[in-house]
Design a protein with these regions (language model features):
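ABC ATPase C-loop
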Residues: 152-153
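Helix-to-loop junction immediately C-terminal to a conserved catalytic motif
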Residues: 52
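Conserved catalytic motifs of ABC-family nucleotide-binding domains
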Residues: 156
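Conserved ABC transporter NBD signature motif
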Residues: 60-67, 80, 114-118
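ABC-type ATPase nucleotide-binding domains, specifically the catalytic core motifs of the NBD
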Residues: 16, 34, 72, 97-116, ...
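The feature captures the beta-strand-to-loop junction immediately N-terminal to the Walker
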Residues: 37-39
Length: 237
């Protein structure tokens, strides 16, 4: 079996005793791009935080490659092979591009391995190679998005969680970033793509789930989801 399988089993997660996630169950198959669609307030980011151990679930299980990670601390979840590209293109503005990327490999003890990963990332993102000494805070939004994705790849994840990669970007940069996400998946990395941009997301995904009010409201292939009238009414205008 390929690595990167994530299983969410009847998960409830609460803020201030109010359940935001109400029995969410879904499976991210290895080697695929699985998307999680939903409007603001649907529970998408809460689910990402629960997977990462930042907002632990109240009930249910989260299983990664056969191991129960529900109660693990975040650093151990990352060490198990899960990385996250957070919403909002978060970079360290006072660090250079290269320094930002190297932060992603903080758990790797071999300088040789870290250097090899850095070279690979710079091949994926030639623009970052050209600007490796530039302060990340002086870069454009699209370039900062590349830095954020590259930093996530530096830990050689089995599963990459990408939260709202289109947020605040021009249509051209959105298309470019989604092309990069597809190429990352083609390298064998499983992707869970959390998005509101339905058209672009379904175009590159193998399977998807729609979250509404903390529950899975629909699931299926991109073709199946696009054919559903309730999904079309909610997301296709």
């Amino acid at each position: 079996m390929m690595s990167g399988t994530l299983e969410i089993e009847d998960v409830f997660t609460a803020y201030d005793k109010a359940d935001v996630l109400q029995g969410v169950s879904l499976k991210v198959e290895p080697g695929r791009i699985t998307c999680l669609l939903g409007s603001n307030g649907s529970g998408k980011t809460t689910l990402v935080r629960s997977i990462l151990g930042l907002t632990p679930s109240r009930l249910g299980r989260i299983v990664f490659d056969g191991a129960d990670i529900t109660r693990l601390p975040t650093h151990k979840i990352i060490a198990a092979g899960i990385a996250c590209i957070p919403e909002g293109r978060k970079v360290f503005p006072k660090l250079t591009v290269e320094e930002n990327l190297r932060v992603g490999a903080y758990q790797e003890r071999s300088d040789k391995v870290s250097a090899a990963r850095l070279d690979e990332i710079l091949q994926i993102f030639p623009r970052l190679s050209e600007r490796r000494t530039q302060l990340a805070g002086t870069m454009s939004g699209g370039e900062q998005a590349m830095v954020s994705i590259g930093r996530g790849l530096m830990c050689a994840p089995k599963l990459l969680l990408i939260d709202e990669p289109s947020l605040g970007l021009s249509p051209r940069l959105v298309k470019e970033n989604f092309s990069i996400i597809r190429s990352i998946n083609e390298r064998g990395i499983t992707v869970l793509l959390v998005e509101q941009n339905v058209h672009q997301t379904l175009a590159i995904s193998h399977y998807g789930f729609v979250l509404s009010k903390g529950r899975v409201a629909a699931s299926g292939t991109p073709t199946e989801l696009a054919a559903r009238q309730d999904v079309r009414d909610a997301y296709f205008g």
